[in-house]
Amino acid sequence: SVAQVSRFLLMFLYSLGEIIPKVRAFAFSNQLGEVTEQFDNFELEIAINQTIHEWGMGSTDYGGALAELERITSSQVDRKTTILILGDARSNYGDPGANSLKRLQEKSKRVIWLNPEPKSFWNTGDSEMQRLSAYCSQVHHCRTLRHLERIISEIARKTV
């Protein structure tokens, strides 16, 4: 489900780095990797193609990805940090990484999860959205530019 909107989500992530200072970007399917340098050093289309080629193949492993994110960023996450996750929360019946997300949430200012699937699909099959949302400040359905605009406006209102 994320494959269909991954380009859109990566364009959003790329654009965030141009607007907000100190954005670190990570991508994953079965492994997590930092793509901040690619986003900083390459034009949009090249950076996105490299990211999809390098990190977008394989079954999603939220447990492994969130554990790796925690390992890599734990010393930098503090009460000023906003963690933004773009994904469908489908665990492929594996570990969804709730414990890692909980620890990251406890150290950060907030965790915002953007899920491209319709809410009616959440918590069906291998979706772990309900379980993972317990450690999120906000959870939103986000599949289009209109959704994204609405969410950004809401986040900005809550930040002021």
Regions from the PLM with identified roles:
Residues S1-K22:
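An amphipathic, basic-hydrophobic helix/alpha-beta surface used to engage anionic
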Residues S1-R7, L32, R90-Y93:
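Short acidic, Gly/Ser-rich segments with clustered Asp/Glu that frequently serve as metal-coordination loops
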Residues L10, P96-K102:
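Charged helix-capping and loop-helix junction motifs
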Residues L16-Q38, E106-D126:
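A short, conserved beta-to-alpha structural element at the edge of catalytic cores
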Residues G33-V35, F39, I46-T81, P118, ...:
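Von Willebrand factor
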Residues K80-L84, R110:
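Structural motif
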Residues Y93-D95, R150-I151:
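Extracytoplasmic/secreted cell-surface and envelope-processing proteins
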Residues K102-V160:
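Von Willebrand factor type A / integrin I
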